[in-house]
Structure formats: structure tokens, C-alpha cells
């Protein structure tokens, strides 16, 4: 006896019954699904509760999506302190190069943490507290559109 000559015992491996393939196959016509009705057909759609008002329609609608909403990537003063040295320029390109931002979205600098280095900021959007913190250290903010 060798592995490549092994065979299953006759009758131990039964072929699966293919239903709905005609009378001669033994499972034709109703294919084991009984008389006509909901259970004979395909499954009910997702969220269907047998005719009862479904949950997604029972719960009230809330809110709206503002078409003018702008999502910003945020960079904190702590990040600038850690990644930049004194006198460097902070721009969209340098932020991308240093891995502080990833997506192609506008950037906003926020005032979390402290800043001790003089930096030149070329980012259009800053929080008011970040602006004052940068100017207090002696950094400059260049207006960019």
C-alpha cells in the first residue's frame, strides 16, 4: 500500500444531490422547497422584517451634510518643534516630505504644545492661538493663498 494508490471505500463518498435539475434527477419540480410562497423563492432582502415597518424606517432622520464643509489635516506646534530646526520654512511641501501630512487636503496649524524655534510659516490656515505662539517666539507668517 502506497499513498498514491489509496482509494475511498466504495459507498463512503456520496455525490451531492443537485436539486432543481428535472424529474429524472429525483429532486426536480419543487426541489425540496415545498409549495409556492416566500420560502420557495430566493431570500428576503436585507432589512426586511416580514412586512413590519423596518428599523431603518422607524428611526427618525437627523442632521444633514454641509456641502461647504472643509476637512483639514491638523498639524500641532509640538510636531513642528520635533521635526523642524530653527530658521526652516514650514510649507505644504516640507510637511509632506517630513511625513506630517498624508492626504491631499488643506492643512491647519493648531496650538497644541509649545514652540521654541523661529520658523517661517507658509501655510494659509492657522488657529489664532497658534499665530500668537509663533509670533511670540519671533517666527514669521507669510500669507499664502
Swiss-Prot record:
**A Gene Ontology term for the protein's cellular component:** cytosolic large ribosomal subunit
> Which InterPro entries has this protein been placed in?
Ribosomal_uL15, Ribosomal_uL15/eL18, Ribosomal_uL15/eL18_sf, Ribosomal_uL15_bac-type, Ribosomal_uL15_CS
Bias (Basic residues) occurs at: 13-26
Q: Does the keyword ATP-binding apply?
A: no
Instruction: Name one molecular function that GO assigns to this entry.
Output: rRNA binding
Gene3D superfamilies recorded: 3.100.10.10
The record, for Pfam families, names:
Ribosomal_L27A
Region annotated Disordered sits at: 1-42
Q: Which GO terms describe its biological process?
A: translation
| Assembly and oligomerization | Part of the 50S ribosomal subunit.
Q: What does this protein do?
A: Binds to the 23S rRNA.
The family line of this record is: Belongs to the universal ribosomal protein uL15 family.
Which protein is depicted? Large ribosomal subunit protein uL15
Which organism does this sequence originate in?
Metamycoplasma arthritidis (strain 158L3-1)
